[in-house]
């Protein structure tokens, strides 16, 4: 291993530690409560569950126990029936649940790439030219998603 590679790895590890520390220090209760996007998402999740076509679950990465507790309490305050699966940072989501033929909606492209490689269907929340992209979970209500999925599976 070259000195340059060791220095690069050390820098990445320092950055990763700083990122994890950043996420550990966030006031998750306040952040989640103030997120209009998340609150709107749960309005759609309720409709998706009601229709019975999909069985949604919350699959979320966590960096600390405090974040996990805050996210769990938040989700439970919005919907007490949905499954919540917390994935420790550094572990791929497809290693925790079976991705095969399952749909993952995620804003992080790295998760989507791993999910696709594991046989799952990846949908970008936001925009990414490499994935079917959505900006609302409303696409999963009725037949909104079917056209986008047809395009993705061609």
Identify the function of each model-found stretch.
Residues 79, 95-98, 108-154:
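Asp-based, Mg2+/Mn2+-dependent phosphohydrolase catalytic module
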Residues 58, 104-105, 123-124:
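A structural signal for short, well-ordered beta-strand segments and their strand-loop junctions
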Residues 1-29, 117-118:
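Active-site neighborhood of HAD-like aspartate-dependent phosphohydrolases
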Residues 49-50, 76, 116:
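N-terminal cationic-hydrophobic initiation segments that often serve targeting/anchoring roles
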Residues 38-42, 68-72, 108, 142, ...:
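A structural signal for well-ordered alpha-helical scaffolds and beta->alpha junctions
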Residues 59-102, 109-112:
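Substrate-recognition "cap/lid" segment bordering the active-site pocket of phosphatases
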Residues 24-58, 65-69:
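Short, acidic loop-to-helix structural element flanking the phosphoryl-transfer center
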């Amino acid at each position: 291993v070259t000195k340059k590679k060791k220095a690069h790895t050390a820098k990445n590890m320092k950055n990763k530690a700083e990122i994890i520390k950043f996420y550990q220090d966030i006031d998750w209760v306040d952040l989640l409560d103030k997120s209009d996007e998340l609150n709107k998402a749960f309005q759609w999740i309720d409709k998706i569950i009601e229709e019975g076509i999909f069985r949604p679950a919350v699959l979320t990465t966590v960096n600390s126990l405090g974040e996990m507790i805050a996210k769990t309490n938040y989700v439970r305050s919005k919907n007490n029936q949905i499954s919540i699966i917390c994935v420790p940072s550094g572990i791929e989501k497809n290693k925790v649940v079976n991705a095969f033929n399952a749909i993952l909606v995620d804003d992080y492209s790295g998760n989507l790439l791993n999910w696709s490689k594991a046989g799952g269907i990846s949908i970008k929340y936001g925009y990414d030219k490499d994935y079917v992209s959505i900006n609302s979970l409303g696409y999963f209500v009725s037949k909104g998603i079917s056209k986008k999925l047809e395009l993705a599976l061609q």
